[in-house]
């Protein structure tokens, strides 16, 4: 097994997990906000309030900066949660460390599935429009390159 956070002392492992979670979370939210700006011409506040709506429901959309801040906090909690799960899974599935790029790409797809099939349905986020393949493909690519690969490389 390669030298990774798995082989480290607990405090070093925690540091690596947090680093991976914050790097992945930052890349992901930056990509999401950039995509939103390209599509709408609007700033990142709406993206962050959408994330906050998972807990606060529709009132998140009128909550201004405080709700956007909550959205950012919740976003990083999810990113760090995905990182912790990868950290737990990595030593149990030996083929994961044979090719960290492929592993990262696959983990990005997994992150998308968890988000769409578990996190959003269990949240207070308002219902979205019907499934759109193009939007799903963009979301998957963002998660592959901004969540999956960074977590796989850092862990």
Regions found by a protein language model. Name each.
Residues 142-155:
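Hydrophobic cores of alpha-helical transmembrane segments in multi-pass inner/ER membrane proteins
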Residues 8-41:
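N-terminal signal-anchor transmembrane alpha helix
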Residues 37, 41-66:
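Extracytosolic (periplasmic/ER-lumenal) interhelical loops and adjacent juxtamembrane/interface segments
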Residues 25-29, 108-118:
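Aromatic-anchored segments of alpha-helical transmembrane domains
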Residues 92-110:
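Internal alpha-helical transmembrane segments of multi-pass membrane proteins
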Residues 14-19, 68-90, 101-106, ...:
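Hydrophobic alpha-helical transmembrane segments
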Residues 39, 61, 116-140:
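Interfacial helix-loop-helix junctions of multi-pass membrane proteins
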């Amino acid at each position: 097994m390669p030298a990774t956070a798995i082989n480290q002392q607990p405090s070093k492992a925690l540091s690596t997990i947090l680093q991976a979670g914050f790097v992945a979370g930052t890349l992901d939210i930056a990509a999401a906000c950039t995509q939103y700006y390209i599509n709408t011409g609007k700033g990142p506040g709406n993206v962050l309030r959408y994330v906050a709506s998972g807990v606060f429901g529709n009132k998140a959309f009128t909550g201004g900066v405080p709700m956007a801040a909550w959205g950012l906090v919740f976003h990083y909690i999810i990113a760090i949660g995905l990182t912790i799960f990868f950290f737990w899974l990595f030593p149990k599935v030996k083929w994961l460390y044979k090719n960290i790029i492929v592993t990262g790409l696959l983990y990005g797809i997994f992150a998308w599935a968890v988000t769409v099939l578990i996190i959003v349905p269990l949240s207070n986020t308002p219902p979205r429009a019907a499934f759109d393949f193009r939007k799903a493909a963009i979301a998957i690519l963002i998660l592959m390159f901004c969540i999956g690969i960074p977590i796989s490389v850092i862990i």
